[in-house]
A protein has these predicted regions:
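Low-complexity, disordered terminal segments
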Residues: 1-2
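Phospho-regulated, Ser/Thr/Pro-rich intrinsically disordered or coiled-coil terminal scaffolds
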Residues: 5-83, 88-96, 102-105
Length: 147
């Protein structure tokens, strides 16, 4: 993980905090974008895909193992994002943040800029059919030794 300069991050987080919310959602989205664009995060996802992609087959029926692998994938993503948020935002707590994030998304405010990019990516990762297609694509790359 790339480590943020703790002093400047803490000052920015405190300066932008909305009084009605525990966290400044706009700043949180910036931190999530930094995580999502982090080469180490991208590498971790690629390693996961290469490790598990051979389990996936192009067929309508889904094996039970697919659900297990998808859950592990989501845990990996959540671990990275929560780790980055904890580094960047003093006192960050995911259980406090998630209801605020949901409220922000439901308000329609997440339809702009980085917020939209982050929400779209999170939704695509959580969507099982998209995940399965991604794993099938990774399997083809591994099979043909393209990567």
């Amino acid at each position: 993980l790339n480590v943020f300069c703790a002093g400047s991050v803490a000052a920015r987080a405190a300066a932008f905090k909305h009084p009605a919310m525990a966290y400044d959602i706009s700043y949180c989205f910036q931190v999530m974008m930094q995580c999502i664009n982090d080469p180490d995060f991208i590498q971790a996802l690629r390693i996961f895909e290469r490790k598990h992609c051979r389990e996936f087959e192009e067929q309508e029926e889904n094996k039970l193992i697919y659900t297990t692998i998808h859950n592990e994938y989501m845990q990996l993503i959540e671990m990275w994002i929560e780790g980055r948020m904890t580094q960047a935002i003093p006192g960050f707590n995911m259980e406090t943040f998630l209801p605020e994030l949901n409220e922000f998304i439901q308000s329609g405010a997440a339809e702009r800029g980085d917020a939209k990019k982050v929400v779209d990516l999170l939704n695509s990762w959580a969507d099982f059919p998209s995940f399965k297609e991604q794993m099938l694509d990774a399997s083809k790359l591994v099979f043909f030794a393209i990567e």
